Amino acid sequence: MSRSIDLLKKRYLENIKENPDLFIGIELEFPIVNLEGKATDGEVVKDLFRYLPLVLGFTIEKVDDFGNPIQLLDPVSQDTILFEVAYTTIEFAFGKAKSIQEVEERFNFYMATIQNKLGEVNHAIVGCGIHPNWDKNDNQPVAYARYQMLMNYLKLSRTVLGTDLHDYPEYGAFICGSQVQLDVSKPNYLRVINAFNQIEAAKAFLFANSEFSGEDWDTKISRDIFWEESMHGIYAENVGVNARLFKDENDFF
């Protein structure tokens, strides 16, 4: 066994249990929009993050370069509410739960609280994969090194010659997504990877909601284009699904 494969197995397999307790993790991202069709007001969303700890009991986990809260944590559930890349995108990253219903109950409570607050100033969270007012917002990253680094990296697409990359390197500030994490066991982890690899395309079409008004792309899955034809897609391994199913552990590694 090569040294690199040995290290990969040590890093990723040793923590997988034979028969673990099964939990689910969920992350949901949404645009915050100005209901008047204008750009999202940055002061409105920053004020929201100062308000939420007072009413939800969350602690302030991270602040931006100017001291504004950008990530909030519930010490009990470990739920996190944060800005994702830009101040116009809010993310709910839920602590591990036994069922989706547990998460749904907390999510509905958070949403009701937030929508009520935003509604006072004609703003709201909407369920779109692309920010409806992407062309009106300034699409600048949160004033935090991680997000600034990401956006600067995406801008490098304009310096890469001989490639067919799109002209929206700021897309990281206006696309939204969702993630689900499932616990696996040593006996089934490879079967789970293969299964999700096979259903990914169908899932993408069934739940597509990222239609982009800036181009005639004729698709509701523009997020794929944004990722694949950007600096993320320069290396094919960073995008798409696995090219084939894996026969066994050795084949996988």
Which residue stretches match the model-derived regions?
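Loop-rich catalytic cores of soluble enzymes, especially ATP-dependent carboxylate-amine ligases
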Residues: 125-126, 130-253
